[in-house]
Amino acid sequence: MAASIGQKLSSVASRTNSLLKKTVKLTEHTPCACPYYSTAAKRLEHEPRIACRTSETDPRKHTGDHVGLYYTVPEEEMAVIKTGMHPWHLRMMKSFNESCLMVRKPALELKGYLDKLNLKHPVPRFLLYGRRGSGKTLTLHHTMQCCHKDGWIIVHAPWAGQWVRGWYKEVAVSTYKPDRYDLPADSAEWLTHFRAQNLGKLSELKTTSEYIWTKREKAEVGTSFEEIINFGLSRLKFSSDCVGVLLKELRVQAETQGLKVLVVVDSVNAFYVQWNQQNALKNMEKKQLRPGEISLVHNFKKMLSPTWSHGVAICAVSEEANDEDKREDFTPIYLLGQEGFEALDPFIPIYVPDYTEKEALSNINYYIDRNWIQNDYGKTDEGKRELMFVSNRNPFNLAKICAQL
Amino acid sequence: MAGISPWAVKTVHKGTVSSRRLFVIFAHKRFLEFRAQNVVRLSSAPDGNDRLHIAPVTQNKPTAKAVTISKAMRAYMEQARAYDDKMKSEVADFEIGKRHLANIMGEDPDSFTQEDVDRAIEYLLPSGLYDKKARPVMKDPYEIFPKKKAAQFGLDGRPYHWMYFTILPNYYSALYEITWKLEALKDLEDQMRAENRQDEMEGQSFNTASSEWVSLQALKTKMVENIKEKEYKHFVTLMERLASHPLSAREKDFIMEWRVLLQSEELQSAVPEVEVEEGGRMCATASGTRKSSNAIVKVYMPGSGKFNINGKDLTYFSQNLYRETLLLPLVVSGLLGKVDAEVDVELGGPTGQAGAIRLGLSRALLAFVEEDVKEKMRLTGLLTKDPRKRERKKPGQQGARRKFTWKKR
């Protein structure tokens, strides 16, 4: 009996050995001759060049071959996405001394849809969903840069949660409708962001109807969008109304002027679910406000309804926009709730997955290239495997872990 | 030599003719004879140790003198009789009680074992008491009542054991035995060297790698004597001397009586069996526990590093710390990314669950690694169960250790 078990074990051991001796190399991208854009310290000659970049900086030309590779966003286009970017990303880019984004599959999928779109139809809605930190926001940025190159007008809400929470915020009763509430500071901020993203395109656009602010102040027919924005920035009281005016004019003129309008809303579920008791916005009577009562949210919701054409709405749902006890799942139907799902339905869901092994390796290699990973063990195959295991190949998690190495 | 009586040895010894060893030989022989002549009393006791219970069956030869019984002996005999009577009745009670219990449980009284008794007691008298020692129990009386040392001297007041006056007869006779064996080995060595057979001695020394000497506590229990630290050291030194002799493997059985196996040796049996599934994929199953969590881990080889924990992947653990816990066995065994694991884990919190999975994973991985890696894993502490548990709250205190705030008034 003992002998047979011994025999069995030894045979297993030999089989195991044969498997163990097979050293499976991690499959990386093959090196390509890509230019070195950075002004950072020059690479040493003897260092092997790790393939993690592509020289194709035009996001419109990215194909499936580029998936997992980093491309450099030129300075002038960086200005477009910069204002809407999370400070965390900006800090990372500053540390790396260059602004690079990874080409991901969902972005390509989205671009494929946009290329084949018939703009005459009512606005189609795309909804990105995925785990926390899987790259939904950067996918949006990738797409925005793409559309910016194509000359689209971009209407971008970087983080919808900002408009429904905060106990320190100034909340004013709307000058347009008394049962609605304005957020003057947020509206002004958004106007600046809108102006920065569409620099040079707004002066040609004129209003098509008259808007009366007060008895003495009004915007005549034919006022340029620039002027509306300037007015909103100088008279904060009307900044929310200015946002409403701009959005309405865009909806009306998109078809007549032949515009292409890209509406991007990050963490759209903030529009449809109630934020928690402590930090939800409150009016002067300390009454908690529903998202729909806030004029900014109200106006943006109109942009998401299929009542106009020559536009596209791309949204992302995120767990962070929901209350802490409503973050069990990351699917749109769970995060949006009944109301949100009905409002956005029908939409095209796009899943943003965590990194594949190739993408994760490319990311780690990029960090090594940027000296973000300095630990020698982190540069070995085993170290990379451990990083991938602990982070579970989640991009944000990987970045957090690598920050300590 | 055989014709010389033990008493003659003494004479020889007192003369200067014979060596001391001669005395040793005879004394040892006498010791063995003594052991053979005496039978073991209380042999029904489960762990009856012959060192403890040595007592003669009436061996006193009829003498012309009137038998005088010393006072101490008389007192002892009374005590012993009382003890014996008590134990006899207890044993009878226990046997009857066991039969009753078997009848209550509707089982055959003749084949009712101690395990059945334990099960029956737990069923009939369920107890929620925290301390297991405080719960009702029914066991052989010899296990429950403290043992009593049998009389060490006969009716005439003469001690049975020839080392009685050393106070620690068992201890010193053990030392004696060791010395004797060592001397014998030395003789043998001399003889082999004289016959030029040194090459036969290769590999004849005892391998101490997988075991260690019994602890002082264990030695005390084994000898039933109050052995001190100093005496224990003396014992170990002597044993070391025996074990390091080039021919010590000949006395392996004797040496192993005084040694306990290390964990690694026990582990050999703990390696899970490898099953081969359809498609030639091997898998091994093991379980692990930590705190109050239990995990059953099934490891597949070859794999690609996929984890399935209660139907989720590694996101089952939200914190990196817990994933790192799982990482360690894979890194130490060098199987990271080469195996898949299917985990069923229940109870407890994330720390306990991660620890339980780690233990189960390490045990399951044993099936796929080499001997040296197994040893490495053991040394890393992967195969050791973390015995810590939540400590109970005590009455009159705020928690397990914390006291209520003390207020003067």
Please name every model-derived segment:
Chain A
Residues 2-123, 301, 305, 404:
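A short, basic N-terminal segment
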Residues 141-142, 159-160, 167-170, 276-278, ...:
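Short coil/turn segments at secondary-structure boundaries
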Residues 256-336:
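Sensor-1/coupling segment of RecA-like P-loop NTPase cores
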Residues 84-92, 168, 219-228, 339-344, ...:
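Surface-exposed beta-strand-to-loop junctions
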Residues 119-134, 138-255:
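P-loop NTPase nucleotide-binding core
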Residues 150-152, 310-311, 342-348:
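Short glycine-/polar-rich loops that comprise or flank the Walker A/P-loop
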Residues 95-107, 136, 183, 235-243, ...:
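Phosphate/oxyanion-binding active-site loops and adjacent basic polyanion-contact surfaces
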Residues 218-222, 244, 248, 252-258, ...:
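C-terminal alpha-helical "lid" subdomain
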